[in-house]
């Protein structure tokens, strides 16, 4: 015996392929475009419970998060988000506050932002991570997809890591940090992984491996609960899902629908492959790390590693082929239109590309970038 502690973690039973979405949004002052710490004031208009769908707060007081209920169809989950956002906008408008979403704010400074008070979880995180934790002025989209058996969680997670650079590049929306162009499509990706419990998951094969890891990490005081692991893709045992968290925040419901459809189709296909007794694809951990960096740095111009053999392709070309392959699955799940929206992102550019174009058209000024992000979100709501 090696003396390691295995912590039994029950994986909730969830109808397969049901999807839920969490969308983090920034509150900005309508006049200046600066971040505004008004989320606590906005949230007073919403009930304080975890019923789905719901609106909640986040780490910083400048952020609200809208959370859908789980649905079999992506479109229904997105409808939840749209209804919630409409309600948030109705509360924020009289305050002179707009909503925007991107992986980072183009120019607001992190020292000026306030951490949500009276939250033990956030206080513990900040006490442990200090300077790096204080800088987490970032926003993302999280997509949950249900799987019916926890034994499938790690094989599917490892197979999803093969697709992580596609997720990263398609959603990349954080080219700026504190008023500077970073040269990265997703500066958020590299910021977030500075936290000791964030970033890529470790190399695990079975649910027992995961339980042993959680037991070890709890035993040595790294975490108190498995929910404190903020991996790019992680099991969510409480909900019976795999949660893809790598996405930068995106500003339109259409893009969210497309990204969610992509994940739903992949999880559905991979789960079916396991049912057929097939071995799922996975890549060497250093390939996964390299792919994440390439996608964060170059976005849609990244040449990504496609498989364990080291074959490479431009992420846009690779993504087009993937969408075509998944089309029958999308048709069966009722999300074919949403999945094909991925091709629109490839054709018109991811958010970081659109932001850079706006900055260039305005001689490098970044206030118009915030205006652009606000308008993208509002236009997606039909406002």
UniProtKB/Swiss-Prot annotation:
Catalysis: reaction(s): L-cysteine + L-glutamate + ATP = gamma-L-glutamyl-L-cysteine + ADP + phosphate + H(+)
Role description: ATP-dependent carboxylate-amine ligase which exhibits weak glutamate--cysteine ligase activity.
Record-listed E.C. numbers: 6.3.2.2
MF (Gene Ontology): ATP binding; glutamate-cysteine ligase activity
Name of the protein: Putative glutamate--cysteine ligase 2
Naturally occurring in which organism (per UniProt): Clavibacter sepedonicus
An individual GO BP term: modified amino acid biosynthetic process
Keyword terms of this UniProt record: ATP-binding, Ligase, Nucleotide-binding
Keyword Ligase among record annotations: yes
HAMAP family assigned: Glu_cys_ligase_2
Cysteine disulfide partners in this protein: none
Family: Belongs to the glutamate--cysteine ligase type 2 family. YbdK subfamily.
Top-level taxon in the UniProt lineage: Bacteria
